[in-house]
Design a protein with these regions (language model features):
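Glycine-rich phosphate-binding loops of nucleotide-dependent enzymes
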Residues: 1-220
Length: 220
């Protein structure tokens, strides 16, 4: 990774797009403190995050939904949700938050006592996102949320992300599904072989004839 500079403003839905191996997930992992950069700065609300442990970063309001969802299959839906609330240490709000997640994600509300591993792929993705929202994040980072899902479930995931954005959630989205991503985001950065190739408003990028070739690792 080199010369990667990006910004997400409050209330925005911003995408980081690019081919496999471009470094998209590495950027999210660095922001979350999972990967330690050897140089550069990462700042959130004016505070430098470099050197902080992942749990410290989470307590500052950054939540990461990793590629592959990362739910605990042997735990119930409610137990998975409870894990998402640990950074807040506010048991009095827990019940209200579960009710809110049940409203946002009705299928989860119906299956609170069901093991997470018995849910479908799309339902597990909903659970992973709901678990992250239990922390009341100021920034929600989603890493390849549509990966491995059937087309109908991909539609549901993008509708969910769009709905979260419209409700005021600030989101940094990593995705390979460029067309669908540019339909819902405010802005996007195109990452190519470890550096930002271009950036701009979603509408501008959709009109760029060379986006597909750069996305595939070439030059348009």
């Amino acid at each position: 990774m080199r010369e990667v500079s990006l910004e997400v403003r409050t209330g925005e839905l911003v995408a980081l797009i690019g081919a496999n191996g471009a470094g998209k997930s590495t950027v999210l992992s660095a922001i979350a403190g999972v990967v330690k950069p050897v140089s550069g700065e990462i700042a959130f609300e004016g505070e430098l995050l470099i050197g902080m442990a992942p749990e410290q970063i989470a307590r500052r309001g950054i939540a990461l939904v990793p590629e592959g969802r990362g739910i605990f299959p042997s735990l119930t839906v409610e137990e998975n949700l409870r894990l998402g609330a640990y950074v807040r240490n506010n048991g009095s709000e827990y019940k209200r938050d579960v009710e809110e997640m049940s409203r946002r994600f009705p299928i989860l509300g119906e299956r609170l006592h069901q093991a997470g591993g018995t849910l479908s792929g799309g339902e597990q993705q909903q659970l992973a996102i709901a678990r992250a929202l239990m922390s009341h994040p100021k920034l929600l980072m989603l890493d390849e949320p549509s990966l491995g899902l059937a087309p109908v479930l991909v539609d549901q995931v993008f509708e969910l992300i769009d709905g979260l954005h419209r409700s005021g959630v600030t989101i940094l989205l990593v995705e390979q599904n460029v067309d669908r991503t540019l339909d819902i985001v405010d802005r996007a950065y195109l990452l190519n072989t470890g550096r930002i190739e271009t950036e701009g408003a979603a509408g501008q990028l959709k009109r760029r004839v060379d986006i597909a070739s750069v996305y595939m690792g070439g030059r348009g």
